[in-house]
Regions:
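A charged N-terminal "starter" segment
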Residues: 1-156
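Glycine-rich, aromatic-flanked loop segments that form ligand/cofactor-binding clefts
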Residues: 152-166
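Short glycine- and Lys/Arg-enriched binding-loop motifs that mark or flank ligand-binding interfaces
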Residues: 110, 160, 172
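Active-site loop/helix belt of alpha/beta enzymes
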Residues: 1-3, 147, 163-174
Length: 174
């Protein structure tokens, strides 16, 4: 899939009447003066356009789920935008679970990933209705089963299977 935006700059980038660079109607000099630098400025129009491009690229495959990797940038604003575009979320912590929840995400479209998940994180995931939990080892599976039973919930899981090949990674996913 080729991006429709072949430029590095956001779609709404322009030079305004003051001669300053502007993105999404915001004068970047003014933002820098108000918030300091470095400063990350995202363009909602560009983000939404990219989301639509991805959805269009995969529309021939209706069972495809678009997932935003929250570890890239997990804020209320980005989560709300991605959710409103119909994306699910790949989250790796309680903070990310809570952020996408507060942003109004459809929690059934959330996948809780990551190794060494704590009992508190698994409990939060179950209580907030996370759609699937990726399980990395037998200990985590037993812990999740215990927590799910105590909440009288059935949890959809994805099992990470390792074929016994040494890859020198985190001990919890060996």
């Amino acid at each position: 899939m080729n991006s429709t935006n072949q430029s590095l700059k956001p779609l709404t980038t322009k030079i305004n009447e003051a001669g300053n660079l502007e993105i999404g109607g915001c004068d970047l000099i003014g933002l820098a003066e108000k918030y300091g630098t470095p400063l990350y400025v995202l363009d909602e129009e560009t983000i939404r356009k990219i989301c639509k491009d991805y959805k269009n690229a995969f529309k021939a495959y209706p069972k495809t789920n678009m997932m935003y990797a929250s570890k890239a940038l997990c804020t209320m604003a980005t989560s709300a935008i991605m959710s409103s575009e119909g994306f699910g979320f790949d989250v790796v912590s309680a903070g990310e679970i809570y952020t996408v929840y507060k942003a109004g995400a459809d929690m059934s479209k959330v996948l809780f990933n990551g190794n060494n998940k704590s009992a508190d994180e698994l409990t939060l995931a179950i209580e907030l209705g996370v759609g699937r939990i990726s399980v990395d080892n037998f200990f985590e599976l037993a812990l999740l089963n215990e927590i799910a039973k105590s909440h009288k919930k059935v949890v959809d899981v994805l099992l990470r299977i390792t074929p016994g090949i040494e890859c020198h990674t985190h001990e919890y996913i060996q």
